[in-house]
Amino acid sequence: MEAAKKLGPQTAEYTPDMVQETKDLFDLMGVSWMEAPMEAEGAAAVMCSRGDVSAVASQDWDTLLYGSPVMVRNLTSHGTRRFGRVMRAERISLQDTLSEHGITREQLVDLGIMVGTDFHPGIKGIGPKTGLKLMKKHGTMEAVSEAKGFDLPEDLESVRGLFMDHPLGDSAPTATSRAVEEGIREFLQEGRGFSERRVDRAINRLADAGRLRSSSQPSLFDF
């Protein structure tokens, strides 16, 4: 945890109000959530590796470095058009990725550190293709450093540790429930100026998924 606290400021920061508003909206939507002590992808990857969840939905390739057995990209943008092509959800297996490239997870972590992660800017002049070749040839970041003449990061072991054994914390996921339409409308339209049309689309998606209840319907928490 000390390493996490030290390296944490290098990642994106959110205000307490932003975090609380996200929790409030998730509660209104009936979405289960938990607060990770550091990186969301890291905590989710640990949960996936333990079998608590089936996959981690993220655009961040660091998810594989954290050891998630399965990663899903483009989940929320599936079917949309971007840059002239239709986006499709993509399921990525960590084991298949390692086997395809002939490396171990430890080597994948070293490769990620050389290329650049949330915790380290990377080594100048080393991209994914070059880094993979060097890692397969030399085996470790220390050996690559010796062969190519660059200095190792002072916090290398700490960064490795955050990927190989990411902190999960003691927080437990909240319970799931059905979404409350009136509460969502008040939160988004009245409280934050979202257009009625935009909120309607979101409400309709929840209804289509069978996730919506009206305020007149009791929930588990009403008893």
Which residues make up each language-model segment?
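Noncatalytic, basic helical substrate-engagement surface that gates or grips nucleic-acid strands
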Residues: 1-49, 69
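Positions that flank functional sites
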Residues: 41, 63, 204
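Long, highly charged, low-complexity intrinsically disordered interaction regions
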Residues: 48-51, 56-118
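Non-catalytic nucleic-acid-binding/docking modules located in mid-to-C-terminal regions
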Residues: 88-223
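N-proximal short alpha-helices
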Residues: 9, 13-20, 37, 81, ...
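Short secondary-structure transition/capping segments
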Residues: 45-49, 67-71, 133-135, 208-212
